[in-house]
Amino acid sequence: MTTYTVRIGDLVLGPGAPVAVQSMTNTCTADIEETAAQVLELARVGSELVRFTVKDEDDARAVPYIRDRVRQAGCKVPLVGDFHYNGHLLLSRYPQCLEALDKLRINPGNVGAGEHHDSNFRTMVELIAQAGKVARIGVNAGSIDKDLLERGRRENEAQGSPRSEHQVFLEAMVESALSSAAAAQKYGLP
């Protein structure tokens, strides 16, 4: 698999670059003052990227104001928006949120289910690509594509000597990440 060097603000990630520390806020993102203060504190203690959830319209509306407060304080730490079930709607309705972020995280298993998954994912990716932003496909146990996992379980049961549930789960996570990355490239991300 090819890996790329990516610039996020002044930070470089990828081959040859040092490992970067990313932190995530634990504030309500809609609380602009509290979230901006925590971003600044995390940057002060060494975080090189700061991520916060963007789960609803209040959060999406707050993002540009958070960015403004952080930048007005002289802090250039890249801001990362973590999107889940409704990211396609939030990015469509609040382009200023997208513009204010340096990077976005997409959970492929939390972008919609069944027939809506592909169109929701595609909408997010196309908006991110059009804005020239960086995205990360983030797969974890809480956001694995349930359909993909169930398919893996069915295929495993049909084998003469099935693999462990843990192995099936790990394989589904990898497949989810790789297939989502391929789809993201198809929809416009480099």
Language-model-detected regions and their locations in the chain:
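Short, acidic/polar
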Residues: 30-41, 87-95
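N-terminal pre-triad scaffold of radical SAM enzymes
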Residues: 22-25, 139
